[in-house]
């Protein structure tokens, strides 16, 4: 069992920004630059359409920023891009430096727990997924991780951490 946890830890290697954010967020003096309150993703794939037009995705995101809630929708070539576009519509108005940040790598893996969770529903398509994302602002690169049973939730967690990492220490009320 300890070996399984150790293997999972090393699978998360490269996501140090998420781990550091977990520590920073526990501090009493840390002010989150934004909070994602809700995210809805509408993804449609039409296999009868030409390949370049098959996927139509729209994300609606509700974000709290500076004590105010903002709701916005955006489209993308898939759910990750649609969520990223929606978040940026709101956040770049307040934090223009986020326009420098780009998603460079995106990796999804199943986490196999070797019986830790314990039932067959947690295997295969029902398993936890680990999403690892690498971001860059042209100068620095940082990795984030999201782990959930829902691939979209894990992906959104990565995007949140990636954007928040760029803003850490810059947010003042």
Regions found by a protein language model. Give the residues of each.
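Terminal or standalone catalytic/regulatory effector modules within metabolic enzymes
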Residues: 1-173
């Amino acid at each position: 069992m300890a070996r399984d946890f150790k293997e999972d830890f090393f699978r998360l290697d490269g996501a140090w920004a998420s781990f550091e954010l977990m520590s920073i967020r526990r501090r009493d003096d840390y002010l989150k630059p934004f909070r994602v309150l809700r995210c809805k993703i509408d993804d449609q794939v039409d296999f009868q359409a030409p390949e370049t037009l098959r996927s139509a995705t729209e994300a609606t995101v509700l974000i709290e920023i500076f004590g105010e809630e903002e709701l916005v929708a955006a489209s993308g070539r898939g759910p990750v891009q649609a969520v990223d576009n929606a978040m940026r519509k709101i956040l770049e108005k307040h934090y223009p430096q986020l326009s420098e940040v780009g998603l460079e790598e995106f990796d999804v893996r199943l986490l196999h727990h070797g019986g830790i969770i314990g039932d067959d529903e947690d295997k295969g398509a029902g398993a936890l997924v680990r999403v690892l994302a690498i971001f860059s602002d042209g100068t620095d690169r940082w990795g984030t991780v999201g782990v959930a049973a829902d691939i979209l939730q894990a992906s959104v967690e990565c995007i949140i951490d990636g954007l928040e990492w760029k803003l850490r220490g810059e947010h003042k009320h």
